[in-house]
C-alpha cells in the first residue's frame, strides 16, 4: 500500500519483500482464508476465515464519505469535486459468526519502500490509539494514526493485538494518513463501512449495463477502473502495483503506477458506453491538461505521466528488496516516459474525436492542442520508434505506430471539418491517405497479412486494432486474413501473445505469458469480421480466467492459468469492456435478424 498517492513510496510492501511492511488481521493460526469476495456492487472486500474452533468474517475498505473539510479548498483537485471524497483511511472490521476464533493483528509499516525506520507511540492514555512516523524523515512521509477497540502492544516497529472472539463478538482497526475523524467504537466503524458500500452501490447504479450473464464482469471492470482513478486530476493508473513479474522469477518487472496516454481511447469508449460520462470527461480533461503548454513552456506529448501530471518519472531499482517470488529487479519510476512512441498522437486525437461525438460540441480551447498534435504526427510518421509495446531494443518502423499516425491525421481532418476549417481538413486527409498507402505497401506480406514492422514477416497483436480503428473496413480481405493469422499463429493454447520474443528485439531476455488485452482485442476483431460464435467462445474462456475477485493482471500463463504482471491492469479491463459489448451487441443483432458478417458484404 502506497500513501498518500498511489505512486507514493510504499508503507506496506510485503508483496515485494516479506520484510517491507505488512498489516495482518486474521486468526492466529491461519494464513489462507476460506473465501474472499467483493460485496456486490462495490469495492468492500469480504474475507471469510475458518479455524478448527470457529468462523469469522473480515471486511476491508478504503473509506468514502461526504466532504469533510468543507471550509478549506483542496490543493490537489483540478477536476470538479463530487459530493464524496476519500477519507484516506483503511478500515477493517471483524465479526465472529460461529464458535470461537483467536484474532491476531500485526501492523508493521515500512516507510519509503523499507528504507525508512518506523517509530510507534501511544496516543493519549489508552492502549487503543497509536501513531507511527518515519523516524529518519518524518516531514517527508505521512504520519499513520491507528484506532481500534483492541488493546495494542508496541514492539519496536510493530503494533500487535489479540483477542478471543466468541459468536457475535466484533472488533475493528482503522489506519489513517489524514486528519479526518477516526472511529473509536465498532458502531462508528460500522457506520463508515456501510456508508462506503452505499457510495459504491450508488455509483455503479448510474451506469448502463445489459441484462446478460456477463453483466457482472462489466460491472466489476467498471468498479476496477473507478478504483484505479486518481480523482483529484482524473488520471487513470495503468495498475496499482510495481514490479510484479511478467515471467515467474524473471526481469520483465515494471512500475505501472502512472497514467498512459495510450489508455485514453479505450477508456473513453468504455466509460461512455457504460454511462460513466463524468469519469470519462475527467480522464479526458487530464489528458488535455498534460498535452497543453505549461508555465510558458511548450512540452512535447509524452507516453505517460504521473497521476498529478508530472512529466519526469526517472527509473531506479530497489536492490534491498528481494522481489515478488524472487523476481528482480524491483523498479520504481519508468524510463518509458521519454521514449519516442508515435502512437500517442493518434490515441489523443481519437480521444478528442470520441469526446466530441459523445458530448456533441467542440470546445474552442481544443483547437490549438489539436493542431499541434496532428502536425507532430505528420512530421514524424516516417521515422522509426519504440512502438506500442515500449521495446527497449532499437527503434523500428512498427506498423501499429504508422496506423496510429494515420488515426491522428484522419481524426484531425474530421475534427477540422466540424470546426469549419476545410483547409486543414483537406491537408490532413491527404497526409492520412499518404500514410495509409505507405502502410499497405510496406506493412503487408505476400499473404495479405499485416506484419509487425516493415521488412519483417513477424506478426504483432496490435494489428487487431486495425478494424477497430477503422483503418480499413472489416470486410477488407487483408483485415480478415490478419485477424485469422493472429488467431492461428500468434497464440498459445488459444490465448494471444503480443509478439514472438524470439523474433522481436525488445531489449530483454526471457519469456512472457499471453497478453490478456490482446486476447480481448481478438474477441472484438473476430466480431468485426463476422466470426461471432468463435468470438463468444473465446470471450467466455477469457472470463473464466478471471481471478476470484474478477480481476485481471497483464498476462496469463496458458499452462497454469496463473496471472502474471502488474495487477489489476486497467488496459485489460478496458479491452474486456470493448470485447464483451462487441459480442453482446452482435448476438442481439443476430437474434433480431439485423447482423450481417462483414466478410459477406452489404
Residue spans of the language-model regions?
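Acidic, mature catalytic/reactive cores of soluble proteins
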Residues: 1-602
Amino acid at each position: 500500500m502506497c500513501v498518500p498517492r498511489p505512486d507514493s513510496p510504499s508503507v506496506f510492501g510485503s508483496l515485494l519483500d516479506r520484510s517491507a511492511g505488512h498489516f495482518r488481521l486474521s486468526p492466529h493460526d491461519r494464513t489462507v482464508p476460506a473465501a474472499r469476495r467483493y460485496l456486490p456492487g462495490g469495492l468492500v472486500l469480504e474475507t471469510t476465515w475458518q479455524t478448527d474452533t470457529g468462523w469469522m468474517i473480515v471486511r476491508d475498505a478504503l473509506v468514502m464519505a461526504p466532504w469533510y473539510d468543507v471550509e478549506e479548498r483542496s490543493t490537489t483537485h483540478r477536476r470538479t469535486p463530487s459530493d464524496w471524497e476519500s477519507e484516506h483511511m483503511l478500515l477493517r472490521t471483524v465479526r465472529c459468526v460461529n464458535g470461537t476464533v483467536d484474532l491476531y493483528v500485526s501492523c508493521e509499516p515500512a516507510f519509503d519502500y523499507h528504507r525508512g525506520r518506523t517509530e510507534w507511540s501511544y496516543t493519549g492514555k489508552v492502549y487503543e490509539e497509536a501513531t507511527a512516523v518515519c523516524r529518519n524523515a518524518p516531514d517527508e512521509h505521512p504520519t499513520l494514526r491507528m484506532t481500534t477497540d483492541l488493546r495494542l502492544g508496541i514492539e519496536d516497529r510493530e503494533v500487535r493485538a489479540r483477542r478471543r472472539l466468541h459468536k457475535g463478538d466484533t472488533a475493528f482497526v482503522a489506519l489513517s494518513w489524514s486528519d479526518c475523524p477516526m472511529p473509536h467504537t465498532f458502531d462508528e466503524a460500522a457506520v463508515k463501512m456501510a456508508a462506503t458500500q452505499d457510495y459504491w452501490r450508488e455509483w455503479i447504479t448510474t451506469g448502463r449495463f445489459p441484462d446478460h450473464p456477463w453483466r457482472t464482469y462489466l460491472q466489476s471492470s467498471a468498479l476496477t477502473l473507478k478504483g484505479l482513478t486518481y480523482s483529484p486530476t482524473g488520471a487513470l493508473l495503468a495498475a496499482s502495483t510495481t514490479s510484479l513479474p511478467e515471467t515467474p522469477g524473471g526481469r520483465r518487472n515494471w512500475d505501472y503506477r502512472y497514467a498512459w496516454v495510450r489508455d485514453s481511447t479505450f477508456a473513453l469508449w468504455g466509460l461512455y458506453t457504460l454511462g460513466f460520462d463524468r469519469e470519462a470527461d475527467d480522464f479526458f480533461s487530464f489528458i488535455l491538461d498534460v498535452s497543453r503548454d505549461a508555465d510558458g513552456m511548450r512540452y512535447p506529448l509524452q507516453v505517460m505521466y504521473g497521476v498529478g501530471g508530472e512529466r519526469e518519472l526517472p527509473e531506479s531499482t530497489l536492490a534491498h528488496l528481494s522481489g515478488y517470488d524472487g523476481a528482480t529487479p524491483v523498479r520504481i519510476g519508468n524510463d518509458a516516459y521519454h521514449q519516442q512512441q508515435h502512437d500517442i498522437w493518434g490515441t489523443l486525437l481519437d480521444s478528442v474525436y470520441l469526446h466530441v461525438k459523445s458530448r456533441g460540441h467542440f470546445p474552442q480551447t481544443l483547437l490549438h492542442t489539436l493542431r499541434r498534435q496532428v502536425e507532430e504526427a505528420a512530421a514524424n510518421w516516417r521515422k522509426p520508434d519504440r512502438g506500442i509495446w515500449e521495446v527497449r531494443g532499437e527503434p523500428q518502423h512498427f506498423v501499429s505506430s504508422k496506423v496510429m499516425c494515420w488515426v491522428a491525421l484522419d481524426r484531425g481532418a474530421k475534427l477540422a471539418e466540424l470546426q469549419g476549417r476545410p483547409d486543414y481538413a483537406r491537408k490532413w486527409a491527404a497526409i492520412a491517405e499518404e500514410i495509409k498507402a505507405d502502410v499497405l505497401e510496406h506493412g503487408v506480406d505476400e499473404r495479405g497479412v499485416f506484419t509487425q514492422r516493415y521488412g519483417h514477416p513477424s506478426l504483432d497483436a496490435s494489428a487487431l486494432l486495425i478494424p477497430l480503428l477503422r483503418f480499413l473496413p472489416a470486410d477488407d480481405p487483408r483485415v480478415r486474413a490478419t485477424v485469422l493469422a493472429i488467431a492461428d499463429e500468434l497464440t498459445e493454447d488459444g490465448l494471444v501473445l503480443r509478439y514472438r520474443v524470439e523474433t522481436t528485439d525488445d531489449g530483454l531476455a526471457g519469456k512472457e505469458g499471453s497478453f490478456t488485452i490482446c486476447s480481448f482485442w481478438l474477441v472484438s476483431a473476430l466480431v468485426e469480421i463476422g466470426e461471432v460464435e468463435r468470438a463468444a467462445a473465446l470471450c467466455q474462456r477469457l472470463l473464466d480466467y478471471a481471478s476470484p475477485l474478477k480481476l485481471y493482471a497483464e498476462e496469463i500463463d496458458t499452462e497454469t492459468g496463473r496471472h502474471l504482471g502488474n495487477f489489476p491492469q486497467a488496459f485489460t479491463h478496458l479491452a474486456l469492456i470493448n470485447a464483451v459489448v462487441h459480442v453482446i451487441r452482435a448476438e442481439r443483432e443476430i437474434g433480431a435478424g439485423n447482423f450481417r458478417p462483414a466478410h459477406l458484404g452489404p
